[in-house]
């Protein structure tokens, strides 16, 4: 099968990872995969086995299936000659839906169960099951690494996107200092042409907190593996990559429902809290003070991540294409 995928860039974003990982899986299964984006350069942060070409090349090519997930490349995606056009919704409030919904020549897909159901109600037509996404062979526990670090809380540091809830989490953590066992906070983010805001500028950091800027894939994995707790307070997310990566790596996860409903089960493999300081504080306090709870949540995480692997998702999408 000839599969064409469209992205606005290949920077360090969860939506970009989705297309790179799926492309790798489809190539491994013998399919011909081409990624179109404006600059046409290969991603530098994650190996990619498909073909990468400039967006303008799509006009002279054909495919069996074309997949797009953003409004910026939508026009080129629709003009591209393909047997089927699929718009893959990966975030709530996706601006691309303004064009995709009334376009009945486009098949819709979504990356979470909640988003899929919401989109089906709004569109009045079927939505492909594009739910899932994790590389469990990479994101996996390494108990020895965690045992060698002090009590550590890991947080997605992307403050340029308020919906990630980074500052909310930092304020909650600051309020817990001195009221729970001593802990350190580590935040991660990248700063590049696609995410220019330095998250360290004006960050309301609690004591003993630090940023790791631009971690490699291996360094990011090590951060998950060495952290005891991961906190995500997102809103309007499609699929919370970081929460699932933490879960798969054996962290005790505290999260909101946004982007986690498919895999986070309250009191089983995570503590799921309302996105409010009171409820987040209560949940984080529990995992920081109760070592047995931390261990129980951490132990349940890796197995619960397995059904959502990229290989499973790639096969599922191929069956629907």
What are these regions (language model features)?
Residues 4, 109, 145-164, 170-174:
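Conserved donor-binding/catalytic core segment of Leloir-type glycosyltransferases
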Residues 105-141:
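Donor nucleotide-sugar binding/catalytic pocket of nucleotide-sugar-dependent glycosyltransferases
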Residues 197-215:
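Nucleotide-activated donor-binding/catalytic signature segment of Leloir-type glycosyltransferases, i.e.
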Residues 222-227:
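Short alpha-helical donor nucleotide-sugar binding micro-motif in glycosyltransferases
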Residues 235:
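Aromatic "clamp/platform" in nucleotide-sugar-dependent glycosyltransferases that forms part
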Residues 252-255:
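Short hydrophobic beta-strand element within catalytic cores of glycosyltransferases
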Residues 266-278, 286-291:
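Conserved acidic donor-binding segment of nucleotide-sugar-dependent glycosyltransferases
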Residues 289-321:
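A charged, aromatic-enriched C-terminal amphipathic alpha-helix characteristic of glycosyltransferases
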